[in-house]
């Protein structure tokens, strides 16, 4: 059992303030909001953590991982899960990962684009979620294309449905549940980014980081992460070692 001091550093308000990002369809990272309720892998993990710590869970809902990053960096949020990259590591401290994501592009119905390499061309308009690891990787790997950032997966999905853009950047697992909503759209094979979805806490809270890491590792070992992925519809997903 963690010490009272460790718990206080992780949750100084007496509540576990857990940050989650929502989208129109679930992924290994995004939760979905329906009828005033949020569901998803990250929600299941945070609920379990709060139960183990014997404290209430205060879920904080955001449109994208960039917003969650800023909330954690300011200390407004105690714990979250998000894709790792060097830019984020300047703002939050990362613990272990529970899932490895790979980002690619979706192209709308009728598109002539067949590969990720073909996206990196002048005149190609890429739509990505603002302040995310995927948007930063798209800028780095497709310097010849034009990158337009939008605030939410919901807006990206709506633009893809209308064909308002040439390539839409997200992780493969996000497209598993989004693709059925976009008739004629295709997901390009391969990836332009791979990273882990890891637990994160505010910087300079070493006891909080250690405790968060222990909770996640226990969730992986106990099968909780696997069950949460299964419940979200990702029965073939592999838990990160």
Language-model segments: residues:
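Ligand-binding cleft/hinge of the Venus flytrap
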Residues: 28-35, 46-56, 134-152, 179-180, ...
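A ligand-binding cleft/hinge motif common to bilobed small-molecule-binding domains
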Residues: 66, 82-91, 137, 161-193
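Short helix-initiation/N-cap motifs at beta->coil->alpha
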Residues: 58-70, 113-114, 148-162, 195
